[in-house]
């Protein structure tokens, strides 16, 4: 379960940011992740809870927001958001090409917002 290491890294980032602003109590961390980031949201939420229990961050919430996938067609270059389960092999809405697309976004993972006091 790599979500545990992801949660550890996210908490390291949060701890560093809180130190910069001289606040200690974490209330909420909002994380954005791409649909291709290979994250299981429930597993990340569980890992966050496990890692914060018994720490200064106990009781803090994690909010996960999924970013859509954006592709550039390998045939005509049009940018689009694919639909369905086979995201990378979705046909281009302009020319119908199904392969050779370039991923423009959807693999990202970052802390978008931190609430603390």
UniProtKB/Swiss-Prot annotation:
Protein's UniProt name: Hydrogenase maturation factor HypA 1
PANTHER family per UniProt: HYDROGENASE MATURATION FACTOR HYPA
Residues annotated to bind Ni(2+): 2
Organism of provenance: Nitratidesulfovibrio vulgaris (strain ATCC 29579 / DSM 644 / CCUG 34227 / NCIMB 8303 / VKM B-1760 / Hildenborough)
Binding site for Zn(2+): 73, 76, 92, 95
Summary of the function given for this chain in its UniProt record: Involved in the maturation of [NiFe] hydrogenases. Required for nickel insertion into the metal center of the hydrogenase.
Membrane-spanning parts: none
The entry's keywords: Metal-binding, Nickel, Zinc
